[in-house]
């Protein structure tokens, strides 16, 4: 099996590939969002006619966050997530080519210099 072509979709608008609406962020900040499982984690989706996976994680004390897995040989320098512009502490990104069944973790560089690898509750797309 050949190496998959995986790329990040970027846009001029910081939340153009986000599953979060302004209402979601309001509910999240007030502690009243009861369906965060629909937003955080990994979600198969199509963006700009490309199939892939949208990832989102709450990491308010992070300096950098990336997604690692077999698809990038567990390399934390690839598949970097972007912090939301609204300072919610949510990091997110869409990557084409990451499909169903992929195992993943979040690689988190904290603002205190720690490096952590955190498994998501699902940990499989």
PLM features: what roles do these ranges have?
Residues 6-41:
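A general sequence property marking short-to-moderate contiguous segments
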């Amino acid at each position: 099996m050949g190496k998959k072509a995986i790329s990040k979709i970027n846009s001029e608008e910081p939340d153009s590939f986000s599953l979060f609406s302004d209402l979601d962020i309001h509910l999240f900040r007030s502690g009243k969002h009861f369906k965060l499982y629909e937003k955080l984690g990994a979600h198969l989706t199509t963006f700009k006619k490309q199939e892939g996976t949208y990832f989102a994680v709450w990491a308010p004390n992070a300096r950098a966050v990336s997604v690692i897995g077999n698809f990038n040989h567990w390399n934390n320098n690839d598949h970097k997530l972007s912090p939301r512009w609204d300072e919610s502490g949510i990091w997110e990104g869409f990557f084409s080519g990451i499909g169903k069944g992929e195992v993943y973790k979040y690689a988190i560089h904290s603002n205190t210099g720690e490096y952590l690898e955190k498994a998501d509750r699902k940990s499989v797309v």
